Structure formats: structure tokens, C-alpha cells
């Protein structure tokens, strides 16, 4: 349903943001 799609999208975005932050913090870009 719509809610599940939104949740999945939010999870994907959050994961991408977290990965980017980890990359910058660890200098592993």
C-alpha cells in the first residue's frame, strides 16, 4: 500500500544519508 511505499522510501533515504555521514566521518569516501 501507500504507507508501505512511503516507509520503504524513507528507509532507503535514511540509509543513504547514514552511509554518506559515515563516509565523511571515517574519511573513506
Curated annotation (Swiss-Prot):
Annotated InterPro entries: Antimicrobial_frog_2
Cysteines joined through disulfide linkages: 23-29
UniProt KW Zinc keyword: no
Function noted in UniProt: Mast cell degranulating peptide. Causes histamine release from rat peritoneal mast cells in vitro. Has antibacterial activity against the Gram-negative bacterium E.coli K12 and Gram-positive bacterium M.luteus NCT C2665.
Organism: Lithobates sevosus
Subcellular location: Secreted
Gene Ontology terms describing biological process: defense response to Gram-negative bacterium; defense response to Gram-positive bacterium; histamine secretion by mast cell; positive regulation of mast cell degranulation
Family classification: Belongs to the frog skin active peptide (FSAP) family. Ranatuerin subfamily.
Tissue: Expressed by the skin glands.
Cellular component GO terms held in the UniProt record: extracellular region
Keywords from the named record: Amphibian defense peptide, Antibiotic, Antimicrobial, Disulfide bond, Inflammatory response, Mast cell degranulation, Secreted
Protein name: Ranatuerin-2SEa
Record flagged with keyword Oxidoreductase: no
Amino acid at each position: 500500500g501507500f504507507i508501505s511505499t512511503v516507509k520503504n522510501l524513507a528507509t532507503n533515504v535514511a540509509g543513504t544519508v547514514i552511509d554518506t555521514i559515515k563516509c565523511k566521518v571515517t574519511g573513506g569516501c
